[in-house]
Amino acid sequence: MGIKHLFQVIQENAPDAIKAGDIKNHFGRKVAIDASMSIYSFLIAVRSEGQQLMSESGETTSHLMGMFYRTLRMVDNGIKPLYVFDGAPPKLKSGELAKRTARKAEATEAHEEAKETGTAEDVEKFSRRTVRVTREHNAECKKLLKLMGIPYIDAPTEAEAQCAVLARAGKVYAAASEDMDTLCFEAPILLRHLTFSEQRKEPIQEIHLNRALEGLGMDRKQFIDLCILLGCDYLEPIPKVGPNTALKLIREHGSLEKVVEAIENDPKKKYVIPEYWPYQDARELFLHPDVREADHPECDFKWEAPDVEALVEFLVKDKGFNEDRVRNGATRLQKNLKTAQQSRLEGFFKPVARTDEEKASLKRKHDEKLQEQKKRKKEEAKAKKEAKAKPRGAA
């Protein structure tokens, strides 16, 4: 789910934090991708009749189709993807997950009813709501990535939090996810729409955390408090508190502690805090998530050549994919992963801190240059003055 209305809040209050651009702009960059969110998006990319893509044996293959072709698109554009899979969810998230399960059960029932009596739009709408990523989906996607030579790692808990760690450490350029809560985990840069299909023609959104904080006039802790008020995966939102109200409350009171106090002491009782609302626990999960440090052995990764024949065996013979397309994809992987090794120019020219002696020398040269310019201007002004004073016709 992520954070409700957060993109809208940033767009309206810190527009400089958001850049929209083409996928080609990220040539030569390594990106950590929230795998579970990507797989979910592949699964809901259903046909208009509400059916998943399936093999001859009736197995769902939408996740594999999406993972194969969207990864190819990234590699074709010089991006080196690293997929990060979710681990066990934090205990505080269990309430939200239980609600999602209940909603999916209701949607399944509604989907069956819509197939009998509803319109095509109803069928597709409820079909999307029944989708969930299973262990089997994850396992098959991991197998596919290994055969493609694309690295993946397992996060202890939240994939977005692990992506953020890798981005902060400089092991990747950015974290990629549709979930805006990636920013709460302190990802310096969040990329959205990176795994969307080309047909959707959606630009890649690049969101910079430091610019968002600056535009909102908040520190990180206040930003997290704002996100909790907006509505996150860990807590139900406060009824009647929308994005504008949430922003106003944090700006006015500075912290959730003071917001809660103000709401509880309000004689009008305009807002009501849910009976069980452990916002401090939620904040702690954002501030100190269960992650592996970037230098942990399990966070080592590298891109390798695809295993072409094993890829054909898995996708063509087991899953019914077209052999020519799979072989063509493998050829593109081999070629473009080598091309992506050519780092961007910005990677070659990293700024190096200057010594005090070098700084003094540069300042001296700068001052000398200024003095020289002043002297030249003075001489030019004097020459012009003399030229004007000289009588016409004088030799």
From Swiss-Prot:
Residues 122-253 are annotated as: I-domain. Its cofactor is Mg(2+). Gene3D superfamilies: 5' to 3' exonuclease, C-terminal subdomain, 5'-nuclease. Its EC number is 3.1.-.-. DNA binds at residues 47, 70, 158, 231, 233. It is found in: Nucleus, Nucleolus; Nucleus, Nucleoplasm; Mitochondrion. Phosphorylated. Phosphorylation upon DNA damage induces relocalization to the nuclear plasma. Its main location: nucleus. One of its GO terms (biological process) is DNA replication, removal of RNA primer. GO terms for molecular function: 5'-3' exonuclease activity; 5'-flap endonuclease activity; DNA binding; magnesium ion binding. SUPFAM superfamilies: 5' to 3' exonuclease, C-terminal subdomain, PIN domain-like. Mg(2+) 1 binds at residues 34, 86, 158, 160. Mg(2+) 2 binds at residues 179, 181, 233. Keywords: DNA damage, DNA repair, DNA replication, Endonuclease, Exonuclease, Hydrolase, Magnesium, Metal-binding, Mitochondrion, Nuclease, Nucleus, Phosphoprotein. Pfam families: XPG_I (PF00867), XPG_N (PF00752). Residues 1-104 are annotated as: N-domain. Interacts with PCNA. Three molecules of fen1 bind to one PCNA trimer with each molecule binding to one PCNA monomer. PCNA stimulates the nuclease activity without altering cleavage specificity. Belongs to the XPG/RAD2 endonuclease family. FEN1 subfamily. Structure-specific nuclease with 5'-flap endonuclease and 5'-3' exonuclease activities involved in DNA replication and repair. During DNA replication, cleaves the 5'-overhanging flap structure that is generated by displacement synthesis when DNA polymerase encounters the 5'-end of a downstream Okazaki fragment. It enters the flap from the 5'-end and then tracks to cleave the flap base, leaving a nick for ligation. Also involved in the long patch base excision repair (LP-BER) pathway, by cleaving within the apurinic/apyrimidinic (AP) site-terminated flap. PANTHER family: FLAP ENDONUCLEASE 1 (PTHR11081:SF9), FLAP ENDONUCLEASE FAMILY MEMBER (PTHR11081). This is Flap endonuclease 1. It comes from Aspergillus fumigatus (strain ATCC MYA-4609 / CBS 101355 / FGSC A1100 / Af293) (Neosartorya fumigata).
